[in-house]
Regions:
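Acidic carboxylate-rich catalytic motifs and surrounding loops in phosphoryl-/glycosyl-chemistry enzymes
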Residues: 59
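Charged, often glycine-rich, active-site loop that binds/positions anionic groups
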Residues: 34
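Alpha/beta enzyme core
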Residues: 1-29, 38-53, 62-147
Length: 147
Protein backbone atom coordinates (compact mmCIF):
# COMPACT_ATOMS: atom_id res chain seq x y z
CA UNK A 1 0.00 0.00 0.00
CA UNK A 2 0.96 3.60 -0.43
CA UNK A 3 0.37 6.64 -2.59
CA UNK A 4 1.60 5.00 -5.80
CA UNK A 5 -0.60 1.92 -5.31
CA UNK A 6 -3.59 4.12 -4.47
CA UNK A 7 -3.01 6.28 -7.55
CA UNK A 8 -2.75 3.26 -9.82
CA UNK A 9 -5.88 1.66 -8.35
CA UNK A 10 -7.92 4.84 -8.64
CA UNK A 11 -6.87 5.49 -12.22
CA UNK A 12 -7.49 1.85 -13.18
CA UNK A 13 -10.99 2.21 -11.74
CA UNK A 14 -11.63 5.15 -14.07
CA UNK A 15 -11.85 8.08 -11.67
CA UNK A 16 -12.14 11.53 -13.21
CA UNK A 17 -9.61 13.12 -10.84
CA UNK A 18 -7.53 12.38 -7.75
CA UNK A 19 -6.81 14.48 -4.72
CA UNK A 20 -3.76 14.42 -2.48
CA UNK A 21 -4.37 15.37 1.13
CA UNK A 22 -2.98 15.02 4.61
CA UNK A 23 -6.06 13.29 6.05
CA UNK A 24 -4.16 11.38 8.73
CA UNK A 25 -1.67 14.11 9.64
CA UNK A 26 -2.96 14.48 13.19
CA UNK A 27 -3.11 16.37 15.37
CA UNK A 28 -4.22 18.93 12.82
CA UNK A 29 -2.82 22.47 12.84
CA UNK A 30 -4.15 25.74 11.47
CA UNK A 31 -0.66 26.61 10.19
CA UNK A 32 0.85 23.34 9.02
CA UNK A 33 4.55 22.76 9.51
CA UNK A 34 6.52 23.54 6.36
CA UNK A 35 7.97 20.02 6.39
CA UNK A 36 4.49 18.51 5.96
CA UNK A 37 3.74 20.65 2.91
CA UNK A 38 7.20 19.97 1.48
CA UNK A 39 6.71 16.23 1.97
CA UNK A 40 3.37 16.38 0.18
CA UNK A 41 5.01 18.27 -2.70
CA UNK A 42 7.73 15.63 -2.86
CA UNK A 43 5.20 12.78 -3.04
CA UNK A 44 3.14 14.49 -5.74
CA UNK A 45 6.32 15.31 -7.66
CA UNK A 46 7.47 11.70 -7.57
CA UNK A 47 4.06 10.50 -8.79
CA UNK A 48 3.53 13.26 -11.35
CA UNK A 49 4.78 11.21 -14.34
CA UNK A 50 2.12 8.59 -13.54
CA UNK A 51 -0.80 10.95 -12.97
CA UNK A 52 -3.08 10.64 -15.99
CA UNK A 53 -6.10 12.56 -14.66
CA UNK A 54 -6.49 16.05 -13.21
CA UNK A 55 -5.34 16.19 -9.60
CA UNK A 56 -5.98 18.42 -6.66
CA UNK A 57 -4.49 19.04 -3.24
CA UNK A 58 -5.74 19.83 0.25
CA UNK A 59 -3.66 20.59 3.32
CA UNK A 60 -6.34 20.25 5.97
CA UNK A 61 -7.11 23.31 8.06
CA UNK A 62 -4.48 25.40 6.25
CA UNK A 63 -5.72 27.25 3.15
CA UNK A 64 -2.42 29.05 2.60
CA UNK A 65 -0.38 25.84 2.56
CA UNK A 66 -3.01 24.36 0.26
CA UNK A 67 -2.60 27.09 -2.36
CA UNK A 68 1.20 27.00 -2.02
CA UNK A 69 1.16 23.25 -2.60
CA UNK A 70 -1.09 23.68 -5.63
CA UNK A 71 1.27 26.24 -7.10
CA UNK A 72 4.32 24.05 -6.49
CA UNK A 73 2.82 20.87 -7.93
CA UNK A 74 0.72 22.17 -10.81
CA UNK A 75 -2.54 20.94 -9.27
CA UNK A 76 -5.70 21.49 -11.29
CA UNK A 77 -7.75 22.24 -8.18
CA UNK A 78 -7.67 22.80 -4.44
CA UNK A 79 -10.29 21.81 -1.89
CA UNK A 80 -10.38 23.38 1.53
CA UNK A 81 -12.51 25.47 3.82
CA UNK A 82 -11.74 29.01 2.74
CA UNK A 83 -14.67 30.90 4.33
CA UNK A 84 -16.52 31.10 7.62
CA UNK A 85 -15.78 31.18 11.32
CA UNK A 86 -15.59 28.01 13.36
CA UNK A 87 -15.14 26.72 16.87
CA UNK A 88 -13.10 23.54 17.05
CA UNK A 89 -11.25 21.41 19.56
CA UNK A 90 -8.12 23.18 18.26
CA UNK A 91 -9.57 26.60 19.03
CA UNK A 92 -11.30 29.29 16.96
CA UNK A 93 -10.63 29.32 13.22
CA UNK A 94 -11.38 31.95 10.60
CA UNK A 95 -9.85 31.23 7.19
CA UNK A 96 -9.30 34.11 4.75
CA UNK A 97 -10.67 33.36 1.27
CA UNK A 98 -9.48 36.63 -0.22
CA UNK A 99 -5.92 36.11 0.92
CA UNK A 100 -5.88 32.53 -0.39
CA UNK A 101 -7.29 33.50 -3.81
CA UNK A 102 -4.97 36.47 -4.22
CA UNK A 103 -1.97 34.39 -3.18
CA UNK A 104 -2.84 31.70 -5.72
CA UNK A 105 -3.10 34.39 -8.40
CA UNK A 106 0.24 35.93 -7.33
CA UNK A 107 1.78 32.48 -7.74
CA UNK A 108 0.57 32.60 -11.35
CA UNK A 109 -2.06 29.91 -10.77
CA UNK A 110 -5.29 31.72 -11.56
CA UNK A 111 -6.15 28.63 -13.62
CA UNK A 112 -6.29 26.42 -10.51
CA UNK A 113 -9.93 25.77 -9.56
CA UNK A 114 -10.87 26.55 -5.97
CA UNK A 115 -13.39 24.12 -4.51
CA UNK A 116 -14.83 25.40 -1.25
CA UNK A 117 -15.99 23.07 1.48
CA UNK A 118 -18.53 25.11 3.45
CA UNK A 119 -19.20 22.59 6.23
CA UNK A 120 -16.14 21.86 8.36
CA UNK A 121 -15.55 18.44 9.80
CA UNK A 122 -14.57 18.46 13.46
CA UNK A 123 -15.69 22.07 13.88
CA UNK A 124 -18.92 23.94 14.48
CA UNK A 125 -19.78 26.95 12.35
CA UNK A 126 -20.29 30.08 14.39
CA UNK A 127 -22.54 31.32 11.59
CA UNK A 128 -26.05 30.21 12.53
CA UNK A 129 -27.56 30.65 9.07
CA UNK A 130 -28.70 27.41 7.43
CA UNK A 131 -25.99 25.69 5.39
CA UNK A 132 -27.61 26.54 2.01
CA UNK A 133 -27.57 30.23 2.96
CA UNK A 134 -23.91 30.05 3.98
CA UNK A 135 -23.10 28.33 0.67
CA UNK A 136 -24.92 31.01 -1.35
CA UNK A 137 -23.11 33.71 0.59
CA UNK A 138 -19.72 32.08 -0.05
CA UNK A 139 -20.50 31.84 -3.77
CA UNK A 140 -21.37 35.53 -3.91
CA UNK A 141 -18.69 36.97 -1.65
CA UNK A 142 -15.74 34.67 -2.23
CA UNK A 143 -16.20 33.57 -5.88
CA UNK A 144 -15.24 29.88 -5.62
CA UNK A 145 -15.23 27.71 -8.71
CA UNK A 146 -17.46 25.22 -6.87
CA UNK A 147 -18.81 24.53 -3.39
Amino acid sequence: PGARADLRALQAAGVDAVMFGNENDRPYEFAVDTASTATMAYVVGRLRPEIAVPFGVDVLWDPMSTVALAAATGAAFVREIFTGSYASDMGPWTPDAGKALRTLQRYGRGDCAMLYNVSAEFADSLDRRPLPDRARSAVFSSIPDAV
